[in-house]
Amino acid sequence: MKPTAEILTDILAEVRPLIGQGKVADYIPALAKVPNNKLAIAVYTNEGEVIKAGDADESFSIQSISKALSLTLAMCLYKQEEIWARVGKEPSGQAFNSLIQLEMEQGIPRNPFINAGAIVVADLLQSRLSAPRQRLLEFVRQLSGDTHIVYDKVVAASEMMHGDRNAAIAYLMRSFGNFENEVIPVLQNYFHACALKMSCVDLAKTFSYLANKGTSVQTGKPVVSPTQTKQLNALLATCGLYDGAGEFAYRVGMPGKSGVGGGIIAVVPGEMTIAVWSPELDASGNSLAGTKALELLSERIGRSIF
């Protein structure tokens, strides 16, 4: 069965009672102010059709979803061995901002989707690009077809002000020799990437290359190779949802990436990209109602990579 607006609307009605059972991220003050009753879903098919329900055109802070975009950009700039010499490809089994594992593993982060790994990717981008922040913004605007996407400067400043733990992660990696640039500019770029403001429709369009062998459905142009697409989807399936990746694979069965802003993107290779948003999070930091919505969609349309 193909997704329809009616199916999406029904799913949102079914998950709405979950609102109130999760917790909006409050360690970033600007995120704590987001109304907890927001709920959205958007599907972008490989034929270029948008199907949506709820607050699907409203922008929100994508947070860690941006880590998949930064890694994609790094894969366009570096040979794969240059990236994987500095960051691993394994699930962490620890909190996304853990210092303990990083210390034990000599400053090499487990994967590019935990904070330490994404900070290494930001360092890689800083080494190759004269203006990495602007380049990432242009990249996202191009892939989404939305020239109005911006960084939320209030969120970025809020993250920088409350980002001591991320600074500790960066300095710890530098002490192990796994850092090339000055820490503060790299962190500023990292925080800005997390502060990208996008809607579910924007996100579904932006990530369409992951469902289409590396070619953006929105632009018709290649972003990465089919092999790199397979690699990105594999990492998303195993590491994309913090310490809840196994649970997500079990329930939803699609490669995905979440953010503490309450967004999740999910990929059905060869068919479609999906984005959901509900700000309340579960214990792993993933959208509570958003995960349930994806689980229901997977069941209704009979799609899973497993």
Curated annotation (Swiss-Prot):
<feature type="binding site">
    <location>
        <position position="260"/>
    </location>
    <ligand>
        <name>substrate</name>
    </ligand>
</feature>
<dbReference type="GO" id="GO:0004359">
    <property type="term" value="F:glutaminase activity"/>
</dbReference>
<keyword id="KW-0378">Hydrolase</keyword>
<feature type="binding site">
    <location>
        <position position="64"/>
    </location>
    <ligand>
        <name>substrate</name>
    </ligand>
</feature>
<feature type="binding site">
    <location>
        <position position="115"/>
    </location>
    <ligand>
        <name>substrate</name>
    </ligand>
</feature>
<comment type="subunit">
    <text>Homotetramer.</text>
</comment>
<feature type="binding site">
    <location>
        <position position="190"/>
    </location>
    <ligand>
        <name>substrate</name>
    </ligand>
</feature>
<comment type="similarity">
    <text>Belongs to the glutaminase family.</text>
</comment>
<feature type="binding site">
    <location>
        <position position="166"/>
    </location>
    <ligand>
        <name>substrate</name>
    </ligand>
</feature>
<feature type="binding site">
    <location>
        <position position="159"/>
    </location>
    <ligand>
        <name>substrate</name>
    </ligand>
</feature>
<dbReference type="Pfam" id="PF04960">
    <property type="entry name" value="Glutaminase"/>
</dbReference>
<protein>
    <recommendedName>
        <fullName>Glutaminase</fullName>
        <ecNumber>3.5.1.2</ecNumber>
    </recommendedName>
</protein>
<dbReference type="InterPro" id="IPR012338">
    <property type="entry name" value="Beta-lactam/transpept-like"/>
</dbReference>
<dbReference type="GO" id="GO:0006543">
    <property type="term" value="P:glutamine catabolic process"/>
</dbReference>
<dbReference type="GO" id="GO:0006537">
    <property type="term" value="P:glutamate biosynthetic process"/>
</dbReference>
<feature type="binding site">
    <location>
        <position position="242"/>
    </location>
    <ligand>
        <name>substrate</name>
    </ligand>
</feature>
<dbReference type="InterPro" id="IPR015868">
    <property type="entry name" value="Glutaminase"/>
</dbReference>
